[in-house]
């Protein structure tokens, strides 16, 4: 503080105080912001530090400059530029500004925001109060308390920051947001400057949120078209369509007026917000936004407010009612828990409620807000507080609304229709009524009032009394609106349970169907229509879903569904429903019920749909024939309800409702295989009826394919039935009218309500026909160009994927279509980059992208298209493809999320998204990679060796046991699992098959080692692949183990973890009829025996001995017809015999086993002889009891001393040397072994053979007889000449290793030493 003079306080807020000051010894006027540290949490202090760090690096003429910051014992002091005032003061004084001044301010705000966004900084609290006025009329942006500097790994945020009046729609809905939220706020500020009020203003947070989300902006006539267009771009509710960078800079309203500050290149901050994201990053951003999207549809802002209001209402209720009413409430409440559905005849509960519990509040709070105009915003306390400070739980406040404490409960009048109308208005889901629904739910008196009204008025209705209908209809409408408007499923279900819903409703419906006198009343139709609306709203509630937080609601839902299904047949057969409204409403309610069933547990949905084939089959057949009987004279099954009017005399509502209900029964929701299991039998039943020779149902449904309203629903019905019935596919493939209708839909010649979805279903339908029939229905070959046009020119991702699926099927049948490479690559890139909206399960349990991947594979593997692979591998599509696959697999990423945001890191998901890419699609994608890398092998090296390679991460993940278990359980997963595994192994073999830089290869090995790929390969072979397909994984495993010691340890540790299972697999694999597999395994085992200690080798001994320890496996391997197998077996024995006493004992005790070992010495194959001589040599070393048995091998080994293979000569020399100390000197002398070894030592051309011979002679000369022979042969003289030859070598040449052994042997042969 010694640097500044503090002059006067100029502002005060929750943060602290702001003083005007002056820097000592200068005329510089500054603002000093004193922020107390006392009482602030660690989080608040961290946020303050972050704000200071952000401001410290900002240098822009339109952003307040932080000059200094420091701390005292009690405060943090921030020193900034001194501003002349706030922009908000101008609004206070002048109301609004001329457009030219707004234009100048707009250019400066955009300039400041461009600077922040180019540095990846979000302000997150743009409002007039945070815009200061500088000297000369300029503006400066300040208050960076909510600002966030986003790292390169951060794509979107979700934490609620800012002031509600200026919050964007995605922010108030708590959806992930990005920098475009700041741009929305700029639009609000500029609108307020020009008009005098914000574009959305309300004194209630509930009303404000609704306005922001739903209401259009009202445009005064005084705004110029250019300015209006500018604001329209900024105030676009969809952030993806909002005017943003870089287009914002070039808008005519500010073009040429924006100052762009250029700075020297600094550290790489990632892609600035002012530039368009590359496709691969856009894919990541979309995926992250999808992952972090809220699971419910309730904003946290409103949730907190609802909670406050509920607490407030209960608190005031207790204050005003006193102990007596509290006691009465306790005795009148329904006991919690799940009780049997209440019947209408039950005795009504006593109720102390008086009318108008909430009517007074309604009148005082909402009636005055009923005008459609935006109220002028009073300047005092006009802005809602910041959201983080708006709802402090410890200080609940009333948002200007009256509550139940102002109602005189003791002097209320009885119920009136007018009061129910007020309640209806209260629960209507219109912008100004967001508060009341939860208020009603939290009021127990309202719940009892509803229950009482239903009981009392319901009893009157059943007696045909008009007064009962007049009382119950308003209650119905209030209930319907309440069930539709409230999103708090827990509170809503609790209310329904307490009020006796849906039991009372369904009881009313049942009794009304049994009362003939009631059905004669003139008001009966209106009563049923409103009752059906309430039941439909109940079935649509989210607490009926399996994912609901309400545990006992599912049982109530199941009972209600069964009751409704019991009544549906009668409802559809009502004789006096001349207006068709009851049938329509019943069908709509049934459709909603089916949709709720689809999201439920397998047990509940299966029971429901199964009943349509048993006890409720009359409903199912009635629906099917109700659509077709009026048109054609068909036979209706006995008992099936009939629609009483011909279809041609009905409105379009009934056939539309019937077809919609049939589609709801048949169509399986995406990603819910359990639901399809339940519906499959229903589709079988319908398909069987459609395939009957005498049935006219099929032609009737086909004729509806060209009807604007029926088309989409009937397409779904026929498609679902064809999924289960090949016979129906054949019949439809031969129906000219069906094919013509489908072709016309593709060509856009049929006017339908939803062309996009209808076309998508048609494309999949035709794909299914080709797939099932394995040939082209007549005329389909002409569709190639139409479908290709849809694929390359549609911007709807689901259409692109569906068109690709059909093109792939057509291509397999030989249909040609003209696709330009640049066009189909662009189409594929768009489809893989944009968010996927999966509306229908493709045929064959395929994923959303499967058809696209199969088509790409076809296009790239056509003959003469090799150049396309090069173009594709260098395009954006290649990168986007692997990013999309990574997201489908839900791979974990490497950064951490903070403060409610989502970065590139995300916890790994337990299950891949099979709805996007199925096992078949994965196989196609890996085949595409194989084709690409075969053509462009260097691309493979760069993809796999690059640090953090997404492709390498994918390949490693595909070998993980957890993923393979998921793959095996996926639809058709077990079928494609071997293809996936083998493709991955082929791709991982590329670096070892190519000439790769040593450092890069080391990196690849380290990557595979760190992910325990060696262990995973062994587990894959053992648990997931048939024996005939393990050859390639074992080969890769062997390569890894031979090159990397850690991978070898992983192999051994995996065996130790599950010895019984894995040893069993290895035993079978060793004795398989696949020589390459057996050879690789033997090589792996031999390397293990050579490198690791004896404690790790017991499993190898077990493998060779067999379960009965007869060494049958070893005998089989030693006698194997393949040379490579025998050679690797001898090599393995050679390494084992260095350590294993058990194997030495077996050679001695097991009959014929040693003979098999020695038989290898005479093998025709030199490699086998070499390995056999190595094994015999190690058997001879310290042979002990085995020594005499090896005497029979001396002649053979002596003969091999003349073998042309140097390795064999070396091994045999060593073996013979090992036999000397074992008491076989006589046999060695008989075969003239000393003479032969001496000749080798002096004359063999290979130095290593000479060395082995000299070492053998040193060992043998210890036998007196052999020593004497060597002396008699003049060995010393001969060896001396050899030694002299070594000494004559130039000094620069290294001395051979044999020289040392030669000198020592000469010394040992001297007479003095001999004595």
UniProtKB/Swiss-Prot annotation:
Catalytic activity: L-seryl-[protein] + ATP = O-phospho-L-seryl-[protein] + ADP + H(+); L-threonyl-[protein] + ATP = O-phospho-L-threonyl-[protein] + ADP + H(+)
Main location: cytoplasm
Enzyme class, UniProt record, top EC level: transferase
Active site feature: 125 (proton acceptor)
GO cellular component annotations of the record: cell projection; cytoplasm; cytoskeleton; cytosol; extracellular region; nucleus
Signal sequence region: none
An annotated GO BP: epithelial cilium movement involved in extracellular fluid movement
Tissues where this protein is expressed: Expressed at low levels in most fetal tissues, adult ovaries and at high levels in adult testis, where it is localized in germ cells. Expressed in respiratory epithelial cells of the lung.
Protein kinase domain: residues covered: 4-254
Keywords: ATP-binding, Cell projection, Ciliopathy, Cilium biogenesis/degradation, Cytoplasm, Cytoskeleton, Developmental protein, Kinase, Magnesium, Metal-binding, Nucleotide-binding, Nucleus, Primary ciliary dyskinesia, Serine/threonine-protein kinase, Transferase
CDD domains associated with the record: STKc_STK36 (cd14002)
Sequence positions that bind ATP: 10-18, 33
Region of interest: Disordered: 312-346, 365-387
Necessary cofactors: Mg(2+)
Superkingdom: Eukaryota
Effect of residue 33 to R: No effect on nuclear localization of GLI1 or GLI2 or on GLI-mediated transcription
Localisation: Cytoplasm; Nucleus; Cytoplasm, Cytoskeleton, Cilium axoneme
Pfam family, one: HEAT_2
EC annotation from Swiss-Prot or TrEMBL: 2.7.11.1
One Gene Ontology MF term: metal ion binding
Effect listed in the UniProt record for changing residue 767 to Y: In an ovarian papillary serous adenocarcinoma sample; somatic mutation
Task performed by this protein: Serine/threonine protein kinase which plays an important role in the sonic hedgehog (Shh) pathway by regulating the activity of GLI transcription factors. Controls the activity of the transcriptional regulators GLI1, GLI2 and GLI3 by opposing the effect of SUFU and promoting their nuclear localization. GLI2 requires an additional function of STK36 to become transcriptionally active, but the enzyme does not need to possess an active kinase catalytic site for this to occur. Required for postnatal development, possibly by regulating the homeostasis of cerebral spinal fluid or ciliary function.
Subunit text: Interacts with GLI1, GLI2 and GLI3. Interacts with SPAG16 and KIF27.
Pathology noted in the entry: Ciliary dyskinesia, primary, 46: A form of primary ciliary dyskinesia, a disorder characterized by abnormalities of motile cilia. Respiratory infections leading to chronic inflammation and bronchiectasis are recurrent, due to defects in the respiratory cilia. CILD46 is an autosomal recessive form. No situs abnormalities have been observed.
Protein name: Serine/threonine-protein kinase 36
Originating organism: Homo sapiens (Human)
Lineage of source species: Eukaryota, Metazoa, Chordata, Craniata, Vertebrata
Gene label: STK36
């Amino acid at each position: 503080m010694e640097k500044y003079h503090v002059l006067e306080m100029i502002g005060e807020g929750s943060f602290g105080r702001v003083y005007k000051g002056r820097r000592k010894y200068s005329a510089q006027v500054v603002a000093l912001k004193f922020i107390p540290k006392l009482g602030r949490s660690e989080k608040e202090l961290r946020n303050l530090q972050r704000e200071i760090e952000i401001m410290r690096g900002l240098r822009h003429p339109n952003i307040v400059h932080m000059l200094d910051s420091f701390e005292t014992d009690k405060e943090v002091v921030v020193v900034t530029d001194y501003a002349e005032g706030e922009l908000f003061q101008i609004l206070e004084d002048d109301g609004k500004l001329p457009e030219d001044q707004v234009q100048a301010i707009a250019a400066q705000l955009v300039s400041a925001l461009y600077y922040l966004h180019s540095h990846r900084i979000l302000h997150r609290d743009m409002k007039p109060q945070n815009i200061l006025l500088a000297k000369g009329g300029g503006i400066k942006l300040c208050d960076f308390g909510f600002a966030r500097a986003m790292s390169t790994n951060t794509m979107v945020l979700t934490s609620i920051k800012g002031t509600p009046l200026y919050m964007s729609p995605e922010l108030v809905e708590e959806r992930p947001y990005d920098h475009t939220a700041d741009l929305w706020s700029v639009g609000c500020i500029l609108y307020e400057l020009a008009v005098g009020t914000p574009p959305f203003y309300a004194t209630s947070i509930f009303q404000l949120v609704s306005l922001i989300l739903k209401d259009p902006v009202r445009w005064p006539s005084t705004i110029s078209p250019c300015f209006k267009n500018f604001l329209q771009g900024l105030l676009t509710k969809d952030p993806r369509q909002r005017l943003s960078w870089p287009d914002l800079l070039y808008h005519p309203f500010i073009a040429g007026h924006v100052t762009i500050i250029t700075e020297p290149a600094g550290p790489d901050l990632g892609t600035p917000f002012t530039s368009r994201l590359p496709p691969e990053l856009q894919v990541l951003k979309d995926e992250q936004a999808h992952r972090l999207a809220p699971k419910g549809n309730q904003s946290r802002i409103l949730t907190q407010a609802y909670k406050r209001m509920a607490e407030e209402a209960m608190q005031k209720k207790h204050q005003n009612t006193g102990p007596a009413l509290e006691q009465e409430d306790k005795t009148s409440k329904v006991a919690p828990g799940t009780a049997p559905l209440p019947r209408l005849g039950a005795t009504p509960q006593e109720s102390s409620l008086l009318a108008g519990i909430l009517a007074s509040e309604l009148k005082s709070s909402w009636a005055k807000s009923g005008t459609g105009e935006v109220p002028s915003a009073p300047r005092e306390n006009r802005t809602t507080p910041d959201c983080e400070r708006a709802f402090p739980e410890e200080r609940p406040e009333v948002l200007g609304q009256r509550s139940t404490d102002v109602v005189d409960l003791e002097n209320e009048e009885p119920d009136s229709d007018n009061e129910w109308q007020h309640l209806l208005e209260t629960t209507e889901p219109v912008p100004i009524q967001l508060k009341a629904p939860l208020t009603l739910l939290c009021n127990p008196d309202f719940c009892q009032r509803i229950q009482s009204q239903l009981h009392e008025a319901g009893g009157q209705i059943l007696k045909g009394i008009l007064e009962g209908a007049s009382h119950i209809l308003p209650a119905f409408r209030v209930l319907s609106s309440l069930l539709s408007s409230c999103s708090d499923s827990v509170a809503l279900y609790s209310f329904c349970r307490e009020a006796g819903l849906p039991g009372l409703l369904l009881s009313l419906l049942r009794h009304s169907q049994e009362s003939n006198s009631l059905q004669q009343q003139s008001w009966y139709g209106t009563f049923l229509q409103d009752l059906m609306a309430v039941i439909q709203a109940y079935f649509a509630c989210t607490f009926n879903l399996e994912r609901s937080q309400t545990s006992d609601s599912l049982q109530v839902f199941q009972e209600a569904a069964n009751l409704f299904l019991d009544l549906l047949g009668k409802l559809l057969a009502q004789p006096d429903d001349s207006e068709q409204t009851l049938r329509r409403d019943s069908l709509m309610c049934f459709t909603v019920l089916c949709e709720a069933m689809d999201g439920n547990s397998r047990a509940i949905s299966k029971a429901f749909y199964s009943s349509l084939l048993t006890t409720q089959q009359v409903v199912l057949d009635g629906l099917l024939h109700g659509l077709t009987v009026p048109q054609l004279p068909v036979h209706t099954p006995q008992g099936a309800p009939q629609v009483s009017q011909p279809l041609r005399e009905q409105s379009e509502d009934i056939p539309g409702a019937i077809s919609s209900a049939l589609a709801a029964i048949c169509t399986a929701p995406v990603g819910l295989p359990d639901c399809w299991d339940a519906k499959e039998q229903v589709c079988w039943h319908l398909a069987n009826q459609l395939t009957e020779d005498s049935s006219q149902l099929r032609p009737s449904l086909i004729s509806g394919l060209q009807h604007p309203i029926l088309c989409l629903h009937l397409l779904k019905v026929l498609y679902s039935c064809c999924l289960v019935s090949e016979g129906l596919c054949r019949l439809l493939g031969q129906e000219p009218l069906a094919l013509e209708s489908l072709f016309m839909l593709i060509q856009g010649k049929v006017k339908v309500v939803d062309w996009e979805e209808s076309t998508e279903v048609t494309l999949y339908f035709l794909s299914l026909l080709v797939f099932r029939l394995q040939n082209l229905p007549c005329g389909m070959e002409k569709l190639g160009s139409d479908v290709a046009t849809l694929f390359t020119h549609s911007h709807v991702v689901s259409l692109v994927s569906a068109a690709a699926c059909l093109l792939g099927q057509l291509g397999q049948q030989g249909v040609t279509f003209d696709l330009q490479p640049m066009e189909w690559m662009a189409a594929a890139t768009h489809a893989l980059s944009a968010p996927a909206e999966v509306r229908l399960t493709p045929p064959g349990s395929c994923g959303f992208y499967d058809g696209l991947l199969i088509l790409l594979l076809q296009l790239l593997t056509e003959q003469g298209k090799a150049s396309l692979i090069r173009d594709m591998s260098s395009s954006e599509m290649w990168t986007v493809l692997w990013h999309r696959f990574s997201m489908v697999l839900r791979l974990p990423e490497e950064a951490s999320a903070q403060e409610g945001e989502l970065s590139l890191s995300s916890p790994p998901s337990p299950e891949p998204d099979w709805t996007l890419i199925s096992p078949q699609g994965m196989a196609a994608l890996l085949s595409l990679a194989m084709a690409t890398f075969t053509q462009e092998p260097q691309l493979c090296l760069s993809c796999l060796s690059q640090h953090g390679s997404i492709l390498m991460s994918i390949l490693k993940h595909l070998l993980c046991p957890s993923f393979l278990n998921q793959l095996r359980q996926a639809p058709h997963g077990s079928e494609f699992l071997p293809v996936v595994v083998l493709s991955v192994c082929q791709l991982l073999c590329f670096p070892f098959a190519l000439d790769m830089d040593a450092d890069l290869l080391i990196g690849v090995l380290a990557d595979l080692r760190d992910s325990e790929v060696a262990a995973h390969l062994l587990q894959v072979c053992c648990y997931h692949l048939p024996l005939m397909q393990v050859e390639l994984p074992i080969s890769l495993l062997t390569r890894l183990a031979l090159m990397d010691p850690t991978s070898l340890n992983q192999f051994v540790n995996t065996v130790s973890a599950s010895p019984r299972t894995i040893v069993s697999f290895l035993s079978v694999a060793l004795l398989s009829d696949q020589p390459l597999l057996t050879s690789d395994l033997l090589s792996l085992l031999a390397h293990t025996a050579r490198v690791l200690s004896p404690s790790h080798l017991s499993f190898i001994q077990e493998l060779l001995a067999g379960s009965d320890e007869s060494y049958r496996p070893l005998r089989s391997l030693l006698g194997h017809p393949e040379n490579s197998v025998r050679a690797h077996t001898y090599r393995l024995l050679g390494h084992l015999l260095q350590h294993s006493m058990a194997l030495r004992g077996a050679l001695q005790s097991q009959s014929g086993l040693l003979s098999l070992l020695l038989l290898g010495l005479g093998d025709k194959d030199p490699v086998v002889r070499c390995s056999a001589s190595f094994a015999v040599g190690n058997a001879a070393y310290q042979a002990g009891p085995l020594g005499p048995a090896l005497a029979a091998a001396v002649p053979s080994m002596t003969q091999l001393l003349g073998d042309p293979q140097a390795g064999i000569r070396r091994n045999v020399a060593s073996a013979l040397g090992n036999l000397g100390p074992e008491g076989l000197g006589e046999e060695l002398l008989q075969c003239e072994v000393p003479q032969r070894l001496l000749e080798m030592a002096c004359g063999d051309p290979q130095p290593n053979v000479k060395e082995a011979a000299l070492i053998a002679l040193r060992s043998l000369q210890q036998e007196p007889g052999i020593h004497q022979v060597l002396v008699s042969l003049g060995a010393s003289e001969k060896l001396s000449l050899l030694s002299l030859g070594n000494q004559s070598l130039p000094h620069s040449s290294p001395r051979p290793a044999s020289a040392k052994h030669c000198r020592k042997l000469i010394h040992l042969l001297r007479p003095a030493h001999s004595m």
